From Swiss-Prot:
Name listed for the protein in its UniProt record: FERM domain-containing protein 8
Gene Ontology CC entries for this record: cytoskeleton; cytosol; plasma membrane
PROSITE patterns: FERM_3
Compartments, as annotated in UniProt: Cytoplasm, Cytosol; Cell membrane
Biased composition (Polar residues): 373-387
All residue ranges annotated as the FERM domain in the record: 28-374
Chief location of this protein within or outside the cell: cytoplasm
Region (Disordered): 373-395
PANTHER family with a match to the protein in the record: FERM DOMAIN-CONTAINING PROTEIN 8, KREV INTERACTION TRAPPED 1-RELATED
Coiled-coil region: none
Primary gene name: frmd8
Lineage: Eukaryota, Metazoa, Chordata, Craniata, Vertebrata
Organism: Xenopus laevis (African clawed frog)
InterPro entries: Band_41_domain, FERM/acyl-CoA-bd_prot_sf, FERM_2, FERM_central, FERM_domain, KRIT1/FRMD8, PH-like_dom_sf
Gene Ontology biological-process annotations: negative regulation of canonical Wnt signaling pathway; positive regulation of tumor necrosis factor production
Kinase as UniProt keyword: no
């Protein structure tokens, strides 16, 4: 025990020396990163007690952002193992000192990985910023930072997109970064070196393997990535009456609007696993690594390997609970409507994750926040209707956004008369009008839904 404690202390000291947040009681340098790896270096007094709110103000001043940016962006502590948005009252230095404890509590990482992990401060979008409010922003620098973050998430596969959407986004990115289309300057040869900054590299790799055959021009022949992006670049609409600055703002908003169609836009990501359906002659099953995204609108479960949605639910469509049968196995339960062999059922999905507690708390807070700020008129706007039609169309086309229930193992229940027999975890909270007191009985499955 003594040896392990000494090792942990030594690792923590090394971590603090290497960290982007330097310790000390005098004026010290602090490094904050933007999503595009741009660095902001600040000199601050009282680093050990400075709050995220105070540091946020210094960053806004360094970037010459207006005070309205206070609600648009937040400070995050980021590492490959965990991402945490800091509250304004949090003290980043103290959270850094607790980082190893947070990793031990909320990840399954080995002791060695925990000791080697080093977080850094990042200035990025606040997950509690409503999309409608985002589109009201008129400051170009704020829109640029939001665009850079959205593009990063698309390129890295954190925001899985259909090929057709990537084409549109790539064309808009060309316009924003290369200026208005000029047929003499902008050719496939000029686009080719920039392709990995315009189009998700993982889709390019899939196409090389023959999986992407949807890149076709109007003549029906397969087009190159360069030509496809160039075609959408040509189609970006220009308004001659507006200034260059206003044109840039308009195109930033076009890019963001397109990303708003993704159910996980502006979310916080968590890591977990779900049960795979039993497959093969031996009826083998296992677990699938997933990312769970939580934002103001709902929860999405994304296949980390295939980069497509397994299930996406808005808050009116789900109930949830967090349980921990034992200390090392926390579970987030999602309950939603479905059907089994034509029979309407309630489905329970188990997500195994030591971050289930964080997910549950964030879901609850997002629902409370949405209910306190929602506008009845906004729910029935033409834009929302068009978005619903768009998503329905995508599902018919086997979009990456469509639910893939066949890839999930769920526990199914049906209503059973007037008597109440609780056969599922008791929910921590109930926010939905559809959640009257019900009686459920288990659907007898042909195979056991639990792990084998």
């Amino acid at each position: 025990m003594d040896g392990s404690e000494t090792s942990h202390s030594s690792g923590l000291n090394d971590f603090l020396l290497r960290s982007s947040v330097s310790s000390g009681s005098r004026s010290m340098d602090v490094i904050i990163y933007l999503i595009n790896d741009e660095v902001i270096q600040l000199t601050v007094d009282g680093l050990s007690v400075i709050t995220a709110h105070e540091l946020h103000k210094s960053i806004r001043e360094a970037l010459q952002l207006p005070e309205t940016a206070q609600d648009v962006f937040a400070l995050w502590l980021i590492s490959p193992l965990l991402e945490v948005q800091l509250k304004p009252k949090h003290q980043p230095y103290k959270v850094c000192r607790q980082w190893h404890d947070l990793l031990a509590r909320f990840t399954n990482c080995s002791s060695n990985d925990i000791l080697q992990d080093e977080p850094y401060l990042q200035f990025r979008r606040n997950i509690f910023l409503p999309k409608a409010r985002e589109l009201q922003i008129s400051h170009e620098r704020i829109l640029y930072l939001l665009y850079e973050e959205a593009k990063y998430n698309v390129l890295e596969g954190r925001y899985p997109c259909d090929v057709e959407d990537c084409e549109v986004l790539g064309g808009l990115a060309c316009r924003l970064e290369l200026g208005p289309y000029n047929q003499n300057e902008h050719t496939p040869a000029t686009i080719r070196p920039k392709l990995d900054t315009l189009f998700p590299p993982y889709l390019c790799k899939k196409r090389n393997g023959g999986l992407l055959t949807t890149f076709k021009n109007r003549g029906g022949r397969q087009a190159s990535f360069e030509q496809t992006v160039l075609n959408t670049y040509k189609e970006v609409k220009e308004t001659s009456a507006c200034t260059d600055e206003q044109a840039m703002k308009n195109h930033y908003k076009e890019y963001l609007k397109k990303c708003h169609e993704l159910p996980y836009y502006g979310c916080a990501f968590f890591q977990g696993d779900v049960d795979k359906p039993a497959q093969g002659f031996l009826n083998r099953s296992g677990r699938k690594a997933v990312s769970v995204s939580v934002n103001l609108e709902g929860v999405s479960v994304i296949d980390r390997k295939e980069k497509h949605v397994l299930i996406s639910l808005t808050y009116p469509e789900l109930s949830w609970d967090h349980t921990y049968p034992d200390e090392d196995e926390h579970i987030l339960w999602l309950e939603f409507d479905g059907e089994s062999e034509g029979t309407p059922v309630n489905k329970l999905l188990k997500i195994y994750s030591k971050q289930a507690e964080l997910m549950s708390g964030l879901i609850e807070y997002c629902i409370e926040l949405s209910q306190s700020t929602e506008s009845p008129a906004s729910d029935s706007t033409p834009g929302n209707s068009q978005l619903s039609e768009k998503r329905s169309k995508l599902k018919r086309q086997e979009s990456v956004l469509c639910n893939r229930m066949k890839h999930l193992t769920t526990i199914d229940y049906v209503e059973d008369g007037a008597k109440i027999t609780r056969v599922k975890p008791k929910r921590t909270a109930s926010f939905f009008t559809r959640q009257n007191t019900h009686n459920y009985s288990a659907v007898q499955p042909s195979e056991t839904p639990t792990e084998s």
